[in-house]
Amino acid sequence: ESMKDSKYKIIRNLSGHQLQPWDLHSIKSVAVFETRNEDILEEGDALAVEIFITDGDSWINSSNKALIYALTRNLSPVRNPNVKKLQNDIFKRRKTLPFTERYVLEHLGYSKVDFFLLKKTENLKEYPILLEKPGTKIAQFEDVIYVDKDKVIITTK
C-alpha cells in the first residue's frame, strides 16, 4: 500500500521464509503478493517476513556465482583430512547457518585450496548472487514474527 506512489517497486519473485533452529531458510514461505502458496501458519512457527524493493524491473534472477554457503544437513563422508577438519570446524561453529569464504580464510585460518575442495563435495549449499538490471538499486527490509496461540508477535521491534 505505501509503495503505490513511490518510484520503487516490490520485487515479486522473492519471499520470506520459515525459521527453524540452525535453518534460516526452512520449509514454509511467506509471499509478499497473493500467490497459490498454501502454507498454513501454525502455533510455534517463526518466520522472516522479507520485502525487497527496487527501482528496476521488480524481478530477480540468480547468477551462477555464490558468495554465501551453508553446510547441508546430511553430510557425505570426506576423505581429504584437511577438508574433513574444515567441515568439522564449520559444523562445530555454524552448524547449518550461512557463512562466507572470507570467514573460512580469516576466522578459521584455512587455505583457499581447502575451501575449493570443500566446495567440490556435495556438502555445501550455495546461495547464488541475486541480480536485477545493471545500475538498479535494491533495498531489503525484514521483520521476524512468531505465531503464538492467540496472536502474532513481531520479535524485531
What is the meaning of each model-derived region?
Residues E1-K157:
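Active-site neighborhoods and metal-handling regions in enzymes and metal-associated proteins
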